[in-house]
Amino acid sequence: MPRVHAIEDYRNFGIMAHIDAGKTTTTERILYYTGKSHRIGEVHEGAATMDWMEQEQERGITITSAATTAFWNGKRLNIIDTPGHVDFTIEVERSLRVLDGAVCVLDSNQGVEPQTETVWRQGDKYKVPRIVFANKMDKTGADFFKCLQDIIDRLGAKPVAIQLPIGSESNFKGLIDLVRMKAVVWTDESLGAKFEDAEIPEDLLEQAKEYREKMIEAAVELDDDAMAAYLDGNEPEEATLKRLIRKAVLTGAFYPVLCGSAFKNKGVQPLLDAVVDYLPSPVDVPAIKGIDDDGNEVVRQADDKEPLALLAFKIMDDPFVGTITFCRIYSGVLQSGTGVVNSTREKKERIGRMLLMHANNREDIKEAYAGDIVALAGLKEARTGDTLCDPAKPVILEKMEFPEPVIEIAIEPKSKADQEKLGVALAKLAAEDPSFRVSTDIESGQTILKGMGELHLDIKVDILRRTYKVDANIGAPQVAFRERITKRAEVDYTHKKQTGGTGQFAAVKFIVEPNEPGKGYEFESKIVGGAVPKEYIPGVEKGIESVLSSGVVAGFPVVDVKVSLIDGKYHDVDSSALAFEIASRAAFREALQKGKSVLLEPIMKVEVVTPEDYTGSVIGDLNSRRGQIQGQDMRGNANVINAMVPLMNMFGYVNNLRSMSQGRATFTMQFDHYAEAPANVSAEVQKKFA
């Protein structure tokens, strides 16, 4: 079946914003006016089409990005709704990774908020072309011009108004389209579906002329001919103006700003027009790069004729279909029933059902093309960030980077039935979200959940309870300590047990020394002449490994240690692999004591982005947390402070930073390295755990 929509007519875009700026409502209205939704879902009623997890509908925040296809003016829109909460930035990152453009929604009462800064920076990182929608113009305190100033002051970006509001707060009637120099007014009784062009109100004409001139001056800077014509007194025609604004969006020269009130159904259709006119199609953005089998860089153009390459950017568990993998097709054509290779994991997969998603409704399709965002059912191996491709032309697309989890909690199921359900549920949750990890504490047998923040883990626990009906007790958040030796130690140990009949005998001699940081555990047998027979060496290794998970300082895993078996003795009758395992365990524990084991704590690389006024307070606070300031620089008009801080001193930091900066500073942190804990910290931890 041939392609219905030319790839030039695709717009793959996301809607990004601070929590509560009206992102989901804006998406709802887009679905309503593009004819995909017959009833408008209100977020505050808990009925929004895009927010389909129970947790989202209750909390009124969007947690998982839902992908939706809609149509406007003959163009095909693939929309991704992204969360605005700081603990879910992984979702925003992976959405931006597969999108070509974005609409940044601002609350025109609040202007640019902390999380707007975070998502804007993520947009900068992936060079995503953006337009800005100043939403909630009907709200008390709405100020379109403050939004423009905020974009300059807080994002360090260049905004250009291409619309102006007519009235504000409860008098918000419509907008002035500066490109066409027409007023656009909505009729209240038609739920915003009907609007009409009108002449610009007399009292706003001067302001409109002033802002149109600013817009034209910014646009003609991008084209010498248009600039020359403008200097000769000729204003660019509408088509030329649109072409230049589009060029600005694609190059990041400036960001067009529109206005409206999604909740009051005003301004959504012109926003859709702007998406079509100014945001890029898949062929307008740089082609994706990857690496072939030989490690050479290859480029995949957005073209059906190129070899097939798609990127899995989200995994979801669907109660009806099973595992759904959301993929962006970068090149080639994908057909259901074909075999592909998961080049990231070197596994073969067969494409079963292919679905086009609309929030949580779905449509089966047989074929998908370059530029499409599709959901694939039944993939066994795929994980977020994996590449699927043509087996004849393998490629690994750029890997997504996922931050290390920084916080962990223990979870204990209340019954045997809960234990079984928990295992299945956690495997699914970990597959869906790469920033969520699960492990087992060998000592206590407890299951440990690791995540990006407290809300992140709260939501996971909530999903376990509701979706998977697991009843469990949750522990307090903990830090993952480690242990290592600091000096070389030599030990000689003999295990002897004679109790009539067959006894036990094994003697080992070890040299144990610190390994290079990050090298982990290494074992080497230097036995010559059969002092310890070969068949007993696995027993020796097993004995050492049983101690690695629980060191002698406070019972934490031992890292970066090298063990050499240099000598030993055995008995023809009484020796066995088990005897050597017991001897090695005791010898290694003795070596850890002799080698002066110390406690290591995780050190986090912390980046705080703060308005300059709060720099002194932020640095003082980081110092009080045993932080070491690595440097500062300016980003836009914000100060960026980089520091190394022990994780144990970072609990509750988000709330401190928020109150210290009136919510204007944001921070990110990720694991950097382990370092020896000071004596007082080590003593405190030993008292608690040893």
UniProtKB/Swiss-Prot annotation:
Gene3D superfamilies attached here?
Answer: 3.30.230.10, 3.30.70.240, Elongation Factor G (Translational Gtpase), domain 3, P-loop containing nucleotide triphosphate hydrolases, Translation factors
Gene Ontology BP annotations: ribosome disassembly
Keyword Protein biosynthesis among UniProt keywords: yes
Q: Which CDD domains does its entry note?
A: EF-G, EFG_III, EFG_mtEFG1_IV, EFG_mtEFG_C, EFG_mtEFG_II
User: Where's it found, cell-wise?
Assistant: Cytoplasm
Disulfide links within the chain: none
Q: Which UniProt keywords apply?
A: Cytoplasm, Elongation factor, GTP-binding, Nucleotide-binding, Protein biosynthesis
Claim: Lipid metabolism is one of the keywords in the record:
no
Superkingdom of the organism of origin: Bacteria
- Cite the Pfam families for this sequence: EFG_C, EFG_III, EFG_IV, GTP_EFTU, GTP_EFTU_D2
* InterPro entries associated with the record: EFG_II (IPR041095), EFG_III (IPR009022), EFG_III/V (IPR035647), EFG_IV (IPR047872), EFG_V (IPR035649), EFG_V-like (IPR000640), EFTu-like_2 (IPR004161), G_TR_CS (IPR031157)
- Where the record annotates domain tr-type G, the positions are 8-283
**Any idea which positions bind GTP?**
17-24, 81-85, 135-138
Question: Which SUPFAM superfamilies does this one have?
Answer: EF-G C-terminal domain-like, P-loop containing nucleoside triphosphate hydrolases, Ribosomal protein S5 domain 2-like, Translation proteins
> Which GO cellular component terms are attached?
cytoplasm
Molecular function (Gene Ontology), one example = GTP binding
Query: What role is this protein assigned?
Result: Catalyzes the GTP-dependent ribosomal translocation step during translation elongation. During this step, the ribosome changes from the pre-translocational (PRE) to the post-translocational (POST) state as the newly formed A-site-bound peptidyl-tRNA and P-site-bound deacylated tRNA move to the P and E sites, respectively. Catalyzes the coordinated movement of the two tRNA molecules, the mRNA and conformational changes in the ribosome.
Can you tell me which family this protein belongs to? Belongs to the TRAFAC class translation factor GTPase superfamily. Classic translation factor GTPase family. EF-G/EF-2 subfamily.
Put simply, this protein is called: Elongation factor G
Specify the species. Answer: Rhodopseudomonas palustris (strain BisB5)
